[in-house]
Regions:
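Signal peptide processing junction and immediate N-terminal pro/mature segment
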Residues: 18-26
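Structured domain cores in non-transmembrane regions
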Residues: 81-169
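N-terminal Sec/ER secretory leader and immediately downstream segment
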Residues: 25-113
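Bacterial N-terminal signal peptides
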Residues: 8-17
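Short helix-loop boundary/capping segments
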Residues: 136-210
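Short, aromatic- and glycine-rich surface loops/edge beta-strands on solvent-exposed regions
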Residues: 117-139, 241-269
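Extended low-complexity, serine/threonine- and proline-enriched intrinsically disordered segments
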Residues: 76-102, 181-227
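Bacterial N-terminal signal peptides that target proteins for export
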Residues: 1-9
Length: 273
């Protein structure tokens, strides 16, 4: 069912960050602060509810056709300057749950499907202070070419992120309502934020012979300085881009549409090898 949003609300949404989801291979060299182990009290650490993430896993299972052959992973990125990811650790922790979570080199990870841990009110807990990290779902269909992402993969990341509470947004009654709707990713023209591996220059949508360059306004996020402390994409804005799935699918773009990325540091056409 479609949801009507007044024009004033739509304008507000354009300024609100609804990001999921980061691409693998982010450069973390710019973070130079020393690693600080945070005390274990709930609320002191940067963490997420496993119960909510478990619900997101169920969404992934129900929507597998959007990302054929893909697995569901998660990923963390630095949310602000001075956050070092060296020595980062993750643990699934509850009153009766203690499970270490291995991290890949790009800081992505899988989580077990553990109904008992969800009932235990367990948390996916890092050894970083609250507010240090940006969390995303990570879904990539096998065989996707380098420097591209599939539209269906990104849409499924949005669906999972909404349910799993991995979407950072400016607190407001409207934004809270949106996250509770059955399928806001497809039924509303909301901006979802994603990250690439390197600073972005442009993005092209490609499906067969059809090719369209995304507007520059969809790159690097809107300028809203008063909201920077609430936006989890601002520190990584040179790699950030916004997607609105509803209009794209209404225009006939399909799940297998590719987003092709051109990066700031790519060699110009015709450059000598």
């Amino acid at each position: 069912m479609n949801h009507f949003i007044p024009r004033a609300v739509l304008v507000a949404l354009l300024l609100c960050p609804f990001p999921p989801v980061a691409a693998a291979g982010q450069d973390h060299g710019q973070a130079a602060a020393a690693v600080v182990e945070v005390p274990g009290a709930r609320g002191d650490r940067d963490e997420k509810s496993y119960r909510k993430i478990f619900e997101g896993m169920e969404v992934f299972e129900r929507n597998r056709p959007l990302a054929p052959g893909a697995t569901l992973r998660f990923k963390v990125l630095p949310r602000r300057a001075g956050v070092s990811l060296q020595g980062l650790t993750m643990q699934l922790r509850g009153a009766h749950t203690r499970i270490a979570i291995p991290l890949d080199a790009d800081l992505s990870f899988e989580l077990p499907r553990d109904a008992a841990a969800a009932q235990d009110d367990a948390m996916v807990t890092s050894n970083r202070k609250a507010g240090s990290l940006t969390w995303r779902a990570e879904i990539r269909s096998p065989g996707t070419p380098a420097k591209t992402r599939r539209l269906g993969d990104l849409l499924l990341e949005c669906k999972v992120g909404m349910v799993a509470d991995l979407v950072a947004y400016v607190p407001s009654p409207v934004n809270l309502l949106i996250t509770k709707l059955p399928d806001p990713c497809r039924t509303l023209s909301i901006n979802m934020f994603y990250f690439t591996e390197r600073p972005l220059f442009s993005i092209a949508l490609m499906q067969g012979a059809r090719r369209v360059i995304l507007p520059a306004a969809q790159l690097h996020g809107p300028d809203a300085p008063m909201l920077t402390d609430l936006q989890d994409w601002y520190f990584l804005r040179d790699k950030a881009f916004m997607m609105q799935f509803k209009p794209l699918y209404e225009q006939g773009w399909q799940d297998d549409t590719l987003l092709q990325f051109d990066y700031m540091d790519d060699d110009p056409p015709g450059a000598a090898l």
